[in-house]
């Protein structure tokens, strides 16, 4: 299952958003080829009409400057500016995955607004640091960081695959179901970059997991409890 399919599943008002999400993901796939400015302009054009998408996908790049976990990808992308921007997008996918199921509740929308205001005022701080200053969002502290690590690892794996894919998959599945799903969605989606070089076993494994992921997604009442 591709990531855009998962995002559409999480949107209760998903009509008309599918093409937008596909375009956004295309831009994300191209982040190693294009400039940060181009990406930002294109994303602004795509996302501006939808405030929810704007919040989760257009955080200031500077907020991630001090996030140590970004260094995990430094051996994949050489350009630091591009690296930070890609990590910024990945971070916001994580936020979307972990928070959207409660975004329709007024009290949570208020918390999101407050965090957004803090992000605009405290650009010298890391995004993670600002996020956990909100009492309402404290329950998501570990979830966001752990899922981000999984997401980053998955993208890193796409560019520099290792032979022990099955072992990694089994370990993720044993530890946390949502990590298992995310890893496979990212692998399936981003692997288009190196489609001709994809390992046969990797393709077969992803095909088998699609139905499993689809069934599990609709069982996730609250992502934080998975």
UniProtKB/Swiss-Prot annotation:
Protein name listed in UniProt: Late protein I226R
Disulfide cross-links: none
Endpoints of the signal sequence: 1-16
Similarity section: Belongs to the asfivirus I226R family.
Keywords, in A-Z order: Glycoprotein, Host-virus interaction, Inhibition of host NF-kappa-B by virus, Signal
Induction / repression: Expressed in the intermediate phase of the viral replicative cycle (immediately after DNA replication).
Native organism: African swine fever virus (isolate Warthog/Namibia/Wart80/1980) (ASFV)
Biological process terms in GO annotation: symbiont-mediated suppression of host NF-kappaB cascade
Glycosylation sites: 142, 164
Function: Plays a role in the inhibition of host NF-kappa-B and IRF3 signaling pathways. Mechanistically, promotes the degradation of host IKBKG through enhancing its ubiquitination leading to inhibition of both pathways.
